[in-house]
Amino acid sequence: MAYPAISPAVIVRVEKEGEILLARHVQRIPDLYTCLAGYLEVGESAEDGVRREVREETGLEVGDVVYAGSQPWPYPNQLMLAFKARWASGELALQADEIAEARWFDPADLPAI
């Protein structure tokens, strides 16, 4: 019997003092801001993957990582796990090969999708 190979990924809404962190990615739609996301590594919990992805892409540390839901992703064999997290420390230091820009947005002033 063959079992499906699934690639789990995480997406996270990072909050700080009432604002939400959104980023524009280097290799995606130029003006589209999204939450941070990435694939889990072998042997890594989803919560640890959230912390690692945020740290790698922005230089920030997060805490209070809470599962919010899941959905199949539009790419073959992928499952997206959504989380909320709170900024814990650090200043933005972007991973230049992945993130073009990241900034904090007031929920009442989010960029258009």
Task: Please annotate each region the language model reported.
Residues K16-G18, S89:
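Short acidic-glycine loop/turn motifs at beta-strand connectors
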Residues R28-D31:
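A conserved beta-turn-beta hairpin within the catalytic core of GNAT-like acetyltransferases
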Residues M1-V12:
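Cys/His-rich short segments
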Residues I11, L21-R24:
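Beta-strand scaffold of nucleotide-dependent catalytic cores
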Residues L40-I113:
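Unchanged
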